[in-house]
């Protein structure tokens, strides 16, 4: 059975910021391909949501998974609603510190 994958407003903002960052340094085409590849990877959680590392130390139910050694995807699996919520995409070593205090 598949899950619905939802990108939070914060995750969408992260993807736009990643696009802008890469586009300034490497061009719009490369930025677009990278961001689209993150989105496709996240949509894959629909079939296999229980991957990554549980990070209950940051927030109960939170999971993280690396993407191409350049980004960390933060997400939560809601078994009851059969959905995966992507909470954020941290690029190039952005710190997870203080996450437990944010929404």
Predicted regions and their residues:
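Generic structural signal for secondary-structure transition and capping sites
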Residues: 27, 43, 47-51, 70, ...
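Basic/aromatic recognition patch in beta-strand/loop cores that engages polyanionic ligands
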Residues: 48-83
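Enriched for short, Lys/Arg-rich terminal
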Residues: 69-72, 76-103
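Short, hydrophobic secondary-structure boundary micro-motifs
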Residues: 31, 53-55, 98
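Arg/Lys-rich, positively charged N-terminal/basic patches that mediate binding to nucleic acids
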Residues: 1-35
């Amino acid at each position: 059975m598949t899950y619905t994958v939802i990108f939070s407003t914060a995750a969408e903002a992260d993807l736009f910021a990643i696009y802008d960052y890469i586009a300034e340094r490497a061009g719009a085409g490369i930025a677009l391909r990278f961001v689209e590849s993150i989105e496709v990877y996240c949509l894959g959680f629909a079939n296999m949501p229980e991957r990554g590392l549980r990070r209950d130390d940051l927030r109960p139910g939170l999971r993280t998974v690396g993407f191409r050694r350049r980004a960390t995807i933060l997400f939560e699996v809601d078994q009851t609603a059969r959905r995966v919520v992507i909470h954020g995409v941290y690029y190039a070593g952005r710190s997870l510190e203080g996450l437990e205090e944010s929404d």
